[in-house]
């Protein structure tokens, strides 16, 4: 009898852990489609976000070198900007971190003018928090975001959760990149 009760309790706890494998800090903020996804640092995170948007049925366009003018010409409601850099990616794109920061500052300024929701996403883990370029990418995007999504190992120092608390930005913490579908579904109010 005791074994059955213990098994039942353990099973319930296991299900709850699975259901809540990501946590949210801050007030709930929702966003609308269509979505444009870009990167501040030319890492492959934008491609991952774009693909995971598709998995939950979200209408997104990936534009690695997104400029403010493109926002003026299109009717996007949300911009998702991935944080973290790739030296190879920036080299292939013919850019550097200073140019990336200037480009993204322009995108953020235009997005705010249009009343778009800005989502900052650091979903590639601590490997994208190793140098000054990564730091510049993060500090360009995170404080200006309306919502932050961060992978747990990217937040070991609690930078993102502390920033969210300080600025009133909701922060969604996920354990693994593939779990990005959970906060995306919640933020865009879609059922998977």
Task: Please give the residue ranges for each predicted region.
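Bacterial N-terminal signal peptides
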Residues: 11-21
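Bacterial N-terminal signal peptides that target proteins for export
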Residues: 2-12
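Charged, low-complexity C-terminal accessory regions
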Residues: 27-29, 36-38, 150-192
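A short, well-structured beta->alpha microelement
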Residues: 54-74
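Structural recognition of alpha->loop->beta junctions
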Residues: 129-162
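Sec/Tat signal peptide C-region and signal peptidase I cleavage site
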Residues: 22-26
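Short, charged N-terminal beta->alpha structural module
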Residues: 30-56
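A short, gly/pro- and small-residue-rich
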Residues: 91-115, 163-172
